[in-house]
């Protein structure tokens, strides 16, 4: 089976994207490119990057894009998210940074950005920017195993690829069983449900991307 490349945090940098594409051309067996959000950023080449993602060059790996936290904030600023007005972006950035972001993303791209999915399910893998709970949900090595299991269970997947933290990691949740007792007025029943081994994988950000082989479950950072 052909490998996947999982990228996030391009931040509007066309030069970085071109370098990643060039690297992937040299990687034997890499056939699928997933861009897990945060494509945009206050970079002069942001508009050109979005055009390239929407209209790949002939030799490019076809990018499969989902929206991330940055896209969510931009769409909120433009009224695509109802009453939400990018409160988180305003809390984390000053007004000049917000204005730069607005100026570097041409409004011609807004409908395309708004059409992107929250996440993708491929085989038994969930590909998402944050988590199944929220696009801004930041999972990393310190996240409670109970939270990780919840995020996996919501999607009903065995592997969850996440980008929000910007870190590269693989956390393994070992398999086991969930036991429950159900008691009524006549008897008590014991139910056992097997839980498979599951993983949460941080794909990194920018030039730090991840390669994954679904056939062997091998990950390369």
Predicted regions, residues:
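Beta-strand-turn-beta hairpins that frame and shape the catalytic cleft
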Residues: 1-5, 120-126, 195-199
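Binuclear metal-dependent phosphoesterase catalytic core
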Residues: 179-221
């Amino acid at each position: 089976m052909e490998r996947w490349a999982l990228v996030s945090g391009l931040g509007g940098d066309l030069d970085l994207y071109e370098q990643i594409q060039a690297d992937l051309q040299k990687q034997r067996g890499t056939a699928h490119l997933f861009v897990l959000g945060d494509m945009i950023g206050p970079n002069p080449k942001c508009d050109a990057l979005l055009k390239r993602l929407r209209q790949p060059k002939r030799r490019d790996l076809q990018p499969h894009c989902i929206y991330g936290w940055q896209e969510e904030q931009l769409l909120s600023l433009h009224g695509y998210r109802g009453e939400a007005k990018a409160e988180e972006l305003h809390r984390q950035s000053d007004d000049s940074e917000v204005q730069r972001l607005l100026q570097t993303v041409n409004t011609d791209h807004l409908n395309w950005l708004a059409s992107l999915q929250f996440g993708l399910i491929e085989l038994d893998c969930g590909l998402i920017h944050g988590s199944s709970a929220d696009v801004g949900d930041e999972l990393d090595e310190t996240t409670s195993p109970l939270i990780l299991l919840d995020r996996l269970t919501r999607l009903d997947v065995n592997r969850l690829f996440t980008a929000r933290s910007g870190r590269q990691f693989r956390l393994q949740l070992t398999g086991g069983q969930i036991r429950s007792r159900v008691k009524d007025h006549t008897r008590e029943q014991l139910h056992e449900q097997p839980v498979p081994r599951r993983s949460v994988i941080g794909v990194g950000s920018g030039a730090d991307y991840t390669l994954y082989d679904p056939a062997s479950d091998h990950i390369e950072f």
